[in-house]
Amino acid sequence: MWVLEEGLTSLSNVSRIGVLQPNDGDILEQIIDKGAKIIKDAPDSLPFIKKYADVRVVRRFLKGVISGEFEDFIILVFYNKEKALSGASLVSRGRPWYAPEGVTFLNEECSVAFQKGLGLSRAMAYVLEKRAGIDVKLLAFSNANTLNNKMLENTFEKHLGYSSYKTFYKEI
């Protein structure tokens, strides 16, 4: 694992954030096993995610991410102060179709937290802002868990200065 940030911040109880590397398959398997259970079993996960999420497809894709097959994605991992794996996030990097060359966005595609109240979103926002690089013009975060709406709104809008834009969806 390549360590991005180490040490507690005033924003959260995350003590280490890293990027999974090709030799981190054992950590990836823990994330997949715990994450699949959370996403599939949590009563407040969005219905279409519960319905269509396929662990085999997810495993194959995430293995491709850490092997470098999908260069526009990284997997961030989060550890608490006891050094226990506490969550993970799939982050994409790319240029939106409407932006000129040289404009890059970072987007949280999916996150799973194995420990409530850790401040994973705040820690991720902090480290991505700090390490984004000169070409990154926008950070975007998502939420697929309706239970966390108010908490994430509080985190991103009130504490971190983000704006929100609702996404509408309909299963057809």
Question: Language model features by range: what are they?
Answer:
Residues K40-K63:
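Conserved GNAT-fold acetyl-CoA-binding loop/helix
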Residues V77, A84-G94:
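Conserved beta-strand in the GNAT
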Residues L139-E153:
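Conserved beta-strand-loop-alpha-helix junction that forms the acyl-donor binding cleft
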Residues G117-K130:
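Conserved acetyl-CoA-binding loop-helix of GNAT-fold acetyltransferases
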Residues L106-L120:
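A short, internal acetyl-CoA/4′-phosphopantetheine-binding micro-motif in the GNAT/acyltransferase core
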Residues R95-E108:
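A conserved beta-turn-beta hairpin within the catalytic core of GNAT-like acetyltransferases
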Residues R60-V77:
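A short helix-loop-beta-strand connector motif used in the catalytic cores of GNAT acetyltransferases and
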Residues L4-I38:
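A short beta-loop-alpha structural element at the N-terminal edge
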